[in-house]
From Swiss-Prot:
This is Fibrillarin-like rRNA/tRNA 2'-O-methyltransferase. It comes from Saccharolobus islandicus (strain M.16.27) (Sulfolobus islandicus). The gene is flpA. It is an enzyme of class 2 (transferase). Involved in pre-rRNA and tRNA processing. Utilizes the methyl donor S-adenosyl-L-methionine to catalyze the site-specific 2'-hydroxyl methylation of ribose moieties in rRNA and tRNA. Site specificity is provided by a guide RNA that base pairs with the substrate. Methylation occurs at a characteristic distance from the sequence involved in base pairing with the guide RNA. Interacts with nop5. Component of box C/D small ribonucleoprotein (sRNP) particles that contain rpl7ae, FlpA and nop5, plus a guide RNA. It comes from the Archaea. One of its GO terms (biological process) is box C/D sno(s)RNA 3'-end processing. One of its GO terms (molecular function) is RNA binding.
Amino acid sequence: MSEVITVKQTNMENIYECEFNDGSFRLCTRNLVSGFNVYGERLIKYEGVEYREWNAFRSKLAGAILKGLKTNPIRKGTKVLYLGAASGTTISHVSDIIELNGKAYGVEFSPRVVRELLLVAQRRPNIFPLLADARFPQSYKSVVENVDVLYVDIAQPDQTDIAIYNARFFLKVNGYMLLVIKARSIDVTKDPKEIYKAEVEKLENSNFETIQIINLDPYDKDHAIVLSRYKG
């Protein structure tokens, strides 16, 4: 197995680049819970600090960063609402980034998957798992505060509408949304580029300012991620 030779801070807070002796580079985050991984990812020790390798084929946020995301609104102390948290792969790296003074509310609809997310949250006190349907944000309004960032990764035909509805409940004015657009979940017959354009128009018609659109190939085929700012 290749060995790490250096770890460098990227231009994004609490996100690092690990260089290995085989010449490869990979993203990593500083492990909030030393000694424990989440999804089988490699733990990397460098100069007395433990990092977790961040696999872009398992995490769309990592893929977006490697594909040129200009800015990551998720930083130390950020409050994040994550729709579609699944078993905790990406939200665990969000947990590393925001540190203990941040909060990550993870909404997941599947009871079986939430059980896995709960196991992750047991060791990570800044993750708050919620078994809920993202179509009904009023059902978790009493436990989720206003957030700085809304991250949406749900496989539904009306995923953009669900994201906008949640933003109206929870996203601060001038807060950011990272929306994963899953073209094949919306329409299997259309060109993904047409779908991306139509979904971005929905956002812009709902007081979102588009900052960047990133095609996630080769990490996720027929997926894009849209970074936008909510104007309220």
